């Protein structure tokens, strides 16, 4: 199992920090509850509205999954306009 992420160092700006625990994610299907498949899973959250690198990350993910999850690929392209240049 991976080491837990450190907490935010409030003496540093976000630009001066690497990975740290910023969010507590709970799945809506209940599978993040104790004993379930996704209990204690680590998630990487992207702020689609404010992160200048979000579109590039979304595009890379959509392209990576398009053969195995074609509907997810199409949904991401349509919702986030990923057919447009980054």
Q: Which residue ranges define each predicted feature?
A:
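Polar/charged low-complexity regulatory segments
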Residues: 1-65, 70-86
């Amino acid at each position: 199992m991976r080491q837990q992420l450190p907490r935010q160092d409030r003496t540093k700006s976000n630009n001066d920090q690497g990975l740290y625990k910023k969010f507590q994610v709970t799945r809506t299907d209940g599978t993040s509850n104790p004993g379930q498949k996704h209990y204690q899973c680590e998630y990487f959250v992207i702020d689609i509205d404010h992160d200048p690198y979000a579109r590039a990350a979304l595009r890379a993910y959509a392209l990576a999954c398009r053969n195995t999850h074609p509907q997810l690929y199409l949904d991401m392209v349509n919702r986030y306009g990923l057919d447009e240049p980054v």
